[in-house]
Amino acid sequence: MSDITAGSAPRDPYRLGRSHGDGLFSATGHGEGGPASKFVTVAYGFWIFLLSDIIMFSGFFAAYAVLSKATADGPTGKDLFELTRVAAQTGLLLTSSFTGGLAMLASRRRSMAAAQFWLLVTGLFGAAFLFLEVQEFATMVNEQAGPSRSAFLSAFFALVGCHGTHVGLGLLWLGTMMAQLWVKGFRPEILRRVHCFSLFWHALDIIWVAIFTLVYLLGASS
């Protein structure tokens, strides 16, 4: 039968949720013409948020690249950066990303004990990372190398501090989510939050690897 009937508009074959036949569309679980599932729409919106966040960090990276040599005769990255501590931070954050993925898999299996355990481990690794970062900032400020010392340090504190702020907010999100999971169980909205948190944490890992390479490694060698 033709898609165009009397008094009705033609059906869009590319509409989200429409299959090529009469069965369910594999991406949404709905029949042709049906709406996308809540999981798909939330994940899509969260990816847009992550992309906007990456664009923001791109601006910080660009500013740092321009100002990295503007030390105003003050300390440089080679004078300030302790690669041993930064390597430890990197190991902690990468490991926390792995345990965060395990927490997401455990939540999909509806294993409360495993999900809570891996979320807790993820939070502990993230808190240890943040502690080392705050310790680094405090040491630099005590050595008169604060953000007001030079344009280079302003760009450094802005970039690394923004990432640290994201980690801190992620830890607050993690703690809230653990409480919700304990009280409400594996509701669909809780599972979506665990999935989105895992995406967020992986994105912070990717950004940190870029910071570790472009800021610390290159800065300590120049």
Question: Residue spans of the language-model regions?
Answer:
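...captures the hydrophobic TM-helix bundle architecture rather than a specific catalytic motif
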Residues: 1-222
